[in-house]
Every structure is written in C-alpha cells, then in structure tokens.
C-alpha cells in the first residue's frame, strides 16, 4: 500500500518505479481518484459548517422569540443533515475506491534490483560449495522414497487427490528432524523468537501481508459448517509470514523494541493456481507443505541491513547441511507483489540436475505496515512512523528433505543422514530399505 500524498508529491518517480515492473503509469489515475475524494470531503466539511452555523442561529432566533425564523432554520438544518448523510456515503465510497486502487499496485523495487521481464533476468549473487560427485546415476527423491517404502503418493491421492504426499517411518522422522534443526538454529544462535501461530486467519490478516485481494485464487478458504457465511470464513495460511507479520498489526511499538524477529515451523497451504503440469510428481510443489518462516520488524534505517542478515541466517542452514546452493537476486519481473528486493536461495538437486528454489528472502519497506497500520515511535519523538517488514523461508522443510535425499543418496538407494541431523534422529546415520 502506498501513501497517496507521496504519489502526488512525486508522480514521475512513482510511475518510473512501476515501469521497472513492466507496468503502465498509474499516478495520474490515482491522483484523479484522490482529487474526487478530496472534493467530496471538502463539500462535506462545508455542509457540516453550514449545519453548525444554522444550529447556532436557531438558538438565537428562539431567544428573540422569532418562531418563523427558527422554524425556517430547523427545516434548513434537516435538509443539510440529509445532504450530509448522502455526502458521508459518497465519502465512504470514495475512500474505498482509492484504497482499492492503491491496494492493487505492487511495491516499487529498489534501484539496485535488476530490471527484466521474468526469471531470465535474475542475477547470480554468489554460490556456495560444489555438487557432490556420484559414480552412479542419481535418482529423484520420489523414486528414492518409493523404493524405500517410506513415501506413498498413491495413498495420498486416494484420500486427498494430486499434490499431496504421505511420509512414513524414518522419512517422516527425517522431515521432522530437519524442521526442528532449523528452528533450534534460528532461535538459539540467531535470536529469533519461536511462535506457534494460528494456521487459519481472517481477511484482514491476508490483506495486511498482501495475499489479498490480488492472489485470492492461490489460496484455500474454509467455512464453519455448510453456511458459507463470510462472517465465518477463514483462510488457511499460505505461509507463516501472514500470522507472524500480523503480530504487530495495529500496534505502536517503541524504537527500543525493534528489531523484532519471529520464527515459526508450520504447515502451509497453497492452491497452486496456474501450476498445472509443473512438478506433478514428488514434493516440490504441494498443496500442503511444511516451512520454517523468518519475519523481522525493524526501522527504515535498518531494513536493508536486516535483509542481508536474514539471508545469511537462511544460508547457514544449508551450510550446516553441507548442501551446494546459489543465491539469486530476483529481477523486477520475478519478485513478489509486496517486495522491494528479493533474494532466492536455490539448492542443487542432482536427481533433477538443476537448482531449485528453497528460500525466498524479501524486504518490503513500509508496504505491508501501511496495510496493517503497524507503527513505531522513534526515540525522543512524538510522531510515529511505519515499521519496515521482512520475511524469508528459513527454509522450506519439504524441499530441504528433497535436497537431503537427493544429495545424500547412495548407489544402493539408501540415504546417509547429514551429521547435523543425526542428533535429531537418535544418532541414526543411514536410512535404508529396512531402516
């Protein structure tokens, strides 16, 4: 969400920012809508002043026992009140129009974000490690999992349809171990506060982080009973970014409280609209998946620094697991709706012979904070400012499981457990067919 005053003050810069995303100019349209709104507000204020003046005159007329004038003024006040009610309705409609228009526009990229139409314009920032040498043809995770008898897509399809997985035995334990390892790392070494948030949220929470209204088709909604009453409607969270960021919704924090850093290990739910035909086998693109999320709330002066810190925290997970990865700076055409700059971490999957995204770390500026009305009061100042919000995967747990399986597979189909995860597996070193 944007400040319409800032758009009025520098319409050219606003449109130039949108142009980097390949979008047409919007400032003139927004300013026109706002001018209509401001004219309605001015007219309403004039009516309210007329009503107040006439009301005073009624008292004066009655004091002079001028009943005819008092009656005339009361009729005028009644007429003005009717006009005020109509004006208030117009004001509500005008406010809704400008808010809807502003809410439909994505965030403005930072100047150092590469400009391009899509992922082809993404830039490799750096890479870490090397791909493991294997003297056999590596398998993909779903072939490994099914051969172990610990990954059951058929059973999942019978009960839930496509894009679901049943994990069993030691693979289920390994996934849990990965998530617990991540949370422990982020809380004990990096200072994140663990949160166990709701997995169902209302419209306002989804609007606050900008999943709504633009990405409604990508979400799962649920209702109480069969009523389908919007008053009883909830959204299954597509990411713990939603509840974690909304922890500061409609709050005024002190500067001393910042930064706030939250982490959560949750299930996430996505409809994957528009993903037909992509990654139909395996765990890469699921309707339900587990993820460890990182969220930071900070000041405008510190948000760019916090972005780099968040990236390093996410990277450290892969370093501890000794996995080859690279970091991409996303182009303006590939970054998310609410982001001003995004880094993607892509892990190497030998079974696919490709890098695949396992984390996305974004700095959003005050874009989400304006939608949530999340503010802080700088030290020694009376006025408040909007906080800056950041979010990142730390990491996607299911994809981390895929990466461990494919990178630690052996020629006989067994999986070596990474050293960092062995304490979470009761010391187990290998997952084999009878493991």
From Swiss-Prot:
Its EC number is 6.1.1.11. Pfam families: Seryl_tRNA_N, tRNA-synt_2b. ATP binds at residues 270-272, 357-360. Pathway: Aminoacyl-tRNA biosynthesis; selenocysteinyl-tRNA(Sec) biosynthesis; L-seryl-tRNA(Sec) from L-serine and tRNA(Sec): step 1/1. Keywords: Aminoacyl-tRNA synthetase, ATP-binding, Cytoplasm, Ligase, Nucleotide-binding, Protein biosynthesis. InterPro entries: aa-tRNA-synt_IIb, aa-tRNA-synth_II, aa-tRNA-synth_II/BPL/LPL, Ser-tRNA-ligase_type_1, Ser-tRNA-synth_1_N, SerRS_1_N_sf, SerRS_core, tRNA-bd_arm. GO terms for biological process: selenocysteine biosynthetic process; seryl-tRNA aminoacylation. Gene3D superfamilies: Bira Bifunctional Protein, Domain 2, Serine-tRNA synthetase, tRNA binding domain. It comes from the Bacteria. CDD domains: SerRS_core. L-serine binds at residues 239-241, 293, 393. One of its GO terms (cellular component) is cytoplasm. It catalyses: tRNA(Ser) + L-serine + ATP = L-seryl-tRNA(Ser) + AMP + diphosphate + H(+); tRNA(Sec) + L-serine + ATP = L-seryl-tRNA(Sec) + AMP + diphosphate + H(+). It is an enzyme of class 6 (ligase). Catalyzes the attachment of serine to tRNA(Ser). Is also able to aminoacylate tRNA(Sec) with serine, to form the misacylated tRNA L-seryl-tRNA(Sec), which will be further converted into selenocysteinyl-tRNA(Sec). HAMAP family: Ser_tRNA_synth_type1. Belongs to the class-II aminoacyl-tRNA synthetase family. Type-1 seryl-tRNA synthetase subfamily. PANTHER family: SERINE--TRNA LIGASE, SERYL-TRNA SYNTHETASE. Homodimer. The tRNA molecule binds across the dimer. This is Serine--tRNA ligase. It comes from Parvibaculum lavamentivorans (strain DS-1 / DSM 13023 / NCIMB 13966). The gene is serS.
